[in-house]
């Protein structure tokens, strides 16, 4: 953008601020609140101008966000809100998305550290894998680089974790199905060396024993993908289940496909509950009953914690768990048992 007087005035008018404030945002000098900066940047975007280049500007931290594949809508949702929240706080994001067989989380981490990243956010990463080597996280703490994790609390990781209450979500889903008269309930979830999947399986086992006296509940472990869940659902149909709780919305969609392919109906023959409440789940036919992850609340708290560390030069090198309560969203994929 050419910072002539006319364009600066346009932006100032659009944002409801003075031209001097716009100039401070462009030049990275002076005191500008995060909210005012956001309004100025929004005005720049809406008017079609180029944003000021952030490199070299003071008080503009660069935050690395490492997420799994964005083809899973829940990870796309986390990424969207993280980028929005970091931008609102006056930072710049470097987003690294993993895909199977491509660049790994720790490869991304090495590259970001070389770029002198100011802080890091890991979403459902290796920190959530009970089989993973956690040394890179310890190295981050030793370097004094603040970071937080999302959805995968492990006490060995020296950073705060912000996660959905998986156990409460599963308990809520089972209770809903029991109220509908179901007793042949199965859990279709992820591999239990992944912390959220383990929490779901543990909660399912406990609540089925408490409420039904079932000490050997039906649990199918597989990958958190549409295809893997579709394949595993055949076994659940063969075992005569009347309801399936999936560990993710993608798994729920895979289960529904297999149920339909078998000539059965959701929810008339088999009820299905998802987990995430990701984008478009309310627009399916039938709309998916699911456990809603409080993504925005998790993101807001995680980013606030990271920025507090950046502001105080505290390195967050102590583990802490922050658990956020999920909600059951009842839609059309569950019904009374026959």
Indicate residue ranges for each PLM-predicted region.
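N-terminal helix-turn-helix DNA-binding module of bacterial transcription factors
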Residues: 1-59, 338
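N-terminal helix-turn-helix/winged-helix DNA-binding helices
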Residues: 3-7, 41-80, 89, 100, ...
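Hinge/beta->alpha junction and helix N-cap segments in small-molecule ligand-binding domains
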Residues: 35, 67-77, 95-104, 126-129, ...
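Short, well-structured alpha-helical segments in soluble
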Residues: 104-117, 227-239
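Short beta-strand-centered segments that line the small-molecule binding cleft or hinge
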Residues: 106-117, 121-168
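Short acidic capping loops at alpha-helix termini that bridge into adjacent secondary structure
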Residues: 183-184, 214-217, 266-271
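Flexible loop/turn connectors
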Residues: 235-338
């Amino acid at each position: 953008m050419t910072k002539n007087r006319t364009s600066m005035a346009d932006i100032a008018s659009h944002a409801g601020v003075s031209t001097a404030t716009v100039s401070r945002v462009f030049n990275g000098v002076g005191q500008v609140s995060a909210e005012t900066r956001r309004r100025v940047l929004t005005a720049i975007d809406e008017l079609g101008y180029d944003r000021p280049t952030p490199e070299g500007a003071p008080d503009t931290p660069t935050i690395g966000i490492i997420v799994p594949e964005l083809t899973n809508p829940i990870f796309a949702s986390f990424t969207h809100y993280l980028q929005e929240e970091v931008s609102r706080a006056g930072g710049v994001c470097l987003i690294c998305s993993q895909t199977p067989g491509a660049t790994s989380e720790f490869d991304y981490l090495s590259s970001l550290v070389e770029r002198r990243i100011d802080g890091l956010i890991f979403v459902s990463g290796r920190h959530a894998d009970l089989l993973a080597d956690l040394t890179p996280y310890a190295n981050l703490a030793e370097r004094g680089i603040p970071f937080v994790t999302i959805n995968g609390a492990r006490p060995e990781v020296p950073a705060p974790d912000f996660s959905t209450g998986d156990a409460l979500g599963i308990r809520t889903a089972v209770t809903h199905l029991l109220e509908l008269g179901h007793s042949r309930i199965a859990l279709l979830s992820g591999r239990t060396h992944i912390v959220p999947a383990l929490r779901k399986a543990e909660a399912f086992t406990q609540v089925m024993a408490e409420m039904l006296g079932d000490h050997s509940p039906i649990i199918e472990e597989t990958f958190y993908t549409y295809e893997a869940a579709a394949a595993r659902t055949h076994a659940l149909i063969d075992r005569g289940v009347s309801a399936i709780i999936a560990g993710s919305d993608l798994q729920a969609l895979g289960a529904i496909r297999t149920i339909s392919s078998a000539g059965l109906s959701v929810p008339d023959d088999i009820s299905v509950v998802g987990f995430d409440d990701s984008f478009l789940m309310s627009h399916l036919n039938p709309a998916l009953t699911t456990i809603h992850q409080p993504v925005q609340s998790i993101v807001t708290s995680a980013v606030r914690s990271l920025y507090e560390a950046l502001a105080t030069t505290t390195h967050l090198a102590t583990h802490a768990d922050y658990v956020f309560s999920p909600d059951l969203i009842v839609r059309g994929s569950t019904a009374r048992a026959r």
